[in-house]
Amino acid sequence: MSLGPVSPPVNGPVGPLERGLAVLCELTRLAAHQGEAAVRPGDLVRGTGLARSVVDRVVGTLEQLGYVRLDGREVGLAARLMELGNAYLSASGLPDALGPFAERLADGLDESVSVAVPDGDGARFVVQATRRRTMSLAFRIGDLLPAERCAPGALFAAEWDERAWAAWRARRAADPLDAAYPAVPPRHRPAADTGFEARVREAARTGWAADDQMIEPGLVAVSVPVRDASGRTACAVNVVSHTSRHDAASLRAAVLGPLHAEIPAMEAALAAPAEAARAEPGPPGRATAGPAAGPGAEDPARAAKRELGAGYLQSLARGLTVLRALGAPGEEGGGAPHGRTLTAVAEATGLPRATARRSLLTLVELGYAEYAEGDGRAFRPLPRVLELGYAPLGDLSFTELAQPHMRELVRAVHESASLAVLDGGDIRYVARVPTVRIMSVNITIGTRFPAYATSMGRVLLAGLAPGERAAHLAGLAPEPLTRHTVTAVPELARVLERTGRDGYALVDEELEEGLRSLAVPVRGADRRVVAALNIATHAGRGSAESTLEELLPALRTAAARIEADLATASAHHPLGAGERVGA
């Protein structure tokens, strides 16, 4: 079967997909270059060259999909967008196969270790095992570096053909200051001859490459290749240090032995998912996000189009669903290391084959996917997918993920909302969105209260394993904070049992007279309770029953949205700096 030639998509029926990807790239660029969490649509018009009406329709569609967030007149990336990058990472199999080796090397060497893959004439990071110090040295998953300014780049360039070298020279001529690479400090003037070609020849001869402060002063790194079954370099494992601990020569002496010792096992692990995929192809699986699809199901994009009208770009929504489906797990679990056939994609998304084919060919044309005629006629996502917001969104902390949903909750119920974690026998507030009232609850980040007397504390204690909960209660000596505080340990045990069954806790004037609080758990990807979300109100604003009826549904919805973002953001790496919660 021939797929036929790929036509330029911009003026075709899937032009909206290309325009949508352009808007996402510009949002990412602005977030990376300017540190702008949110931008005006006019900024996107200037950056993409698209008409304002087109940008508005693209943004409206992306908001409906949950990939961007609107706050007044500003547009920002939303954490759910990371599911597109997760599709590539799952399909590649690299985090699962090589992540444990990176962690082990980082532990043994006490340095940050990463894995990078070739992406055009650059190196893009896909695995990160960070050692955090005052002087932190690490790249983010999704960051793209120019090949000539990093150690992995020399290893990848050793296998370039003349066409790839010509593309590299053209890129350097067009972008001499590396403005297209927000992950590296921009050059102040065009670089003279970097000696890159000589370093590439040396890397091909020795089997390793070094970065001696090419990215920025103080940063040194050593990389070695990890090869696939055909002998080609599939990726590079990279150790990063600082000149306060190593120079390039001492780092090389310290890490090359341990790196080379791990390479055979890493290459075997990299081959294992591919062999398993050949032996047990399994069912195609369905896309992991959005409404369920499949044969006989209504296309979610069509339903949204019918509801929202001309402002909704159905081709954009379908194209992103197709991209997500390339990394969706099959029923046997895991990603799709050898990609998916056109038939499998159509079945996973519920789209007609012709519709799925158009989207796939557009993704191939734009460099987000490839078609392997000789490998089961499968489509695979490519590392470029990670340019769609993955690196800046990967920097978000747990509290930063939660804040947008907390703001929506406060707007809906007109009461203050807080997020807390268990810290010994106390709860500690890690995020808060207040409301404006004449009478309001005044609490700041870092505030601590006894867990036994708070709704969030009871939710968190109820989420402990039975043995942990019993040990906590055994060491408890509750004091009455008001005349309503439950202080009898057996009664507290019963309250926690009920909280666990009900999935919420309502505390009425036990912490402070006049204060009522309702809390629900926030669970990580493993379904453990990792935090609690609450709404605090004055006890005089209604009965406890009316509080439950009016506030609990909205509170549970907000918690579910936080959980969804937490699962997406932590699927392949820990959350960014800030308050860390297990997931």
Predicted regions and their residues:
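Flexible loop/coil segments at beta-strand boundaries within sensory signal-transduction domains
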Residues: R227-T233, R523-V529
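A short beta-strand signature within small-molecule sensing/ligand-binding domains used
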Residues: P217-P225, E513-P521
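Short, solvent-exposed recognition segments
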Residues: G4, L137-I215, I438-L511
